[in-house]
Amino acid sequence: MKVKICGVTHPEDAEYAALLGADYIGMIFAEKSKRKTSLSMAKSITNTTKRLGAEPVGVFVEQTTDQIIAICEQTGIKTVQLHNSFPSGSLEKLLRDYSIIYAISVRENGDVCHPQSLPPKVIPLYDTEKGGTGKQFNWKAFSSPRDTFWMLAGGLNPANIEEAIATLHPNGVDVATGVEFPNKTRKDPDLLKAFIQSAKILGEKI
């Protein structure tokens, strides 16, 4: 079971998550996000993440290919997460030089908003229509992908991770709000530990 901790804004949070076994550490570059990180902080988080064997991920919304590549080159990020549409510009370069996670919105009733075929090797990540809110969609009504590696996000936390994995059998899980201190963007060490350890243990059983 792959675990992605998203919306990381400080190297200490990245370090603790990686030491606990997180596979991906996500940094947000979307302008409107409360978790948006600066380039200097992202570079520090990226260095910490790589040193501990995890993969840093840049999360982008409504940025062009050139903007994404510029940020990745300045920070050392090699995996990017896109949301609901591919960016304008030379997509071929992005697909050639970077690993891609592609977030697909799911309505509250479990229906995929815009079903589409993805290029090979692009990892689909199914999330609520507005990510980072701590809300989930109807897992029981959602039709899980078959014969492909995919990840689940949307309202996950230590209290419901067992139900989520047992219901949908994802290959990876992604969390932000569910492991944060209340009303803050910093991660809670106790929640990080509970979430990551539970996901790893449960993942071995499916």
Swiss-Prot record:
Keywords assigned by UniProt, alphabetized: Amino-acid biosynthesis, Aromatic amino acid biosynthesis, Isomerase, Tryptophan biosynthesis
CDD domains named among the record's database cross-references: PRAI (cd00405)
PANTHER family xref list: N-(5'-PHOSPHORIBOSYL)ANTHRANILATE ISOMERASE
Residue ranges that the Swiss-Prot or TrEMBL entry lists as coiled coil: none
Gene: trpF
Pathway it works in: Amino-acid biosynthesis; L-tryptophan biosynthesis; L-tryptophan from chorismate: step 3/5
EC number: 5.3.1.24
Disulfide cross-links: none
Alphabetized GO MF terms: phosphoribosylanthranilate isomerase activity
UniProt cross-references to InterPro entries, sorted A to Z: Aldolase_TIM, PRAI_dom, RibuloseP-bd_barrel, TrpF_fam
Entry's family note: Belongs to the TrpF family.
Upper lineage: Bacteria, Pseudomonadati, Chlamydiota, Chlamydiia, Chlamydiales
Name of the molecule in the record: N-(5'-phosphoribosyl)anthranilate isomerase
